[in-house]
Amino acid sequence: MFKALIVALAAVAAAIPTQQPSSNEMNCDSGVYCCNKVAQNTGIVVPIDALSSTCGDTLKLVTVDALNDKCTSQTVCCNNVQQNGLVNVACTPIDV
């Protein structure tokens, strides 16, 4: 009886959905940047531990304000940034 109860509780716990944050809910502690060019990480030039994208060519810090600064290009969140000239490595595209 006790074994059946444990198995039932484990099945219920495994079936409970967990909510994954959408891209709009993602926290970006290191800063949001506006990139004119965003390239996918190919693993050849970019270090293996980098995230999904690199951001290069004209970076500026984006302030999310409805009236003033807006990014007309791709906004990205950069974590564990490795900067080499004008290219930031470890940037993930986000929707603002």
UniProtKB/Swiss-Prot annotation:
CDD domains (UniProt xref): hydrophobin_I (cd23507)
Subunit structure: Self-assembles to form functional amyloid fibrils called rodlets. Self-assembly into fibrillar rodlets occurs spontaneously at hydrophobic:hydrophilic interfaces and the rodlets further associate laterally to form amphipathic monolayers.
Compartment annotation: Secreted; Secreted, Cell wall
Main location: secreted
Entries under InterPro entries matching the protein: Hydrophobin, Hydrophobin_CS
UniProt record, GO biological process: cell wall organization
Name of the protein: Class I hydrophobin ssgA
Disulfide bonds: 28-77, 34-71, 35-55, 78-91
